[in-house]
């Protein structure tokens, strides 16, 4: 008889664990952050002019959020 509980998704997730980010991750993060900042800055200015009030997040926070969301997607692919 075989044990079907050995390779369940819960056990597989625990076996891989959380990997610490490496230097390559930080390089990609920095490049994406530098690319996202000008776009976020222009978007922030347009939003400020259009709505006549400051957005909740500033341009750097917005670029940081975008880089934080995009970089892990590169390594999952």
Curated annotation (Swiss-Prot):
One Pfam entry name: PufQ
GO BP annotations listed: bacteriochlorophyll biosynthetic process; photosynthesis
Keyword 4Fe-4S appears in the UniProt entry: no
InterPro entries: PufQ_cyt-su
Keywords per UniProt: Bacteriochlorophyll biosynthesis, Chlorophyll biosynthesis, Photosynthesis
Domain of life from the UniProt record: Bacteria
Described function: Required for bacteriochlorophyll biosynthesis. Directly involved in the assembly of both the B875 and B800-850 pigment-protein complexes.
Protein family: Belongs to the PufQ family.
The protein, known as: Protein PufQ
Organism: Cereibacter sphaeroides (strain ATCC 17023 / DSM 158 / JCM 6121 / CCUG 31486 / LMG 2827 / NBRC 12203 / NCIMB 8253 / ATH 2.4.1.)
Gene from which the chain derives: pufQ
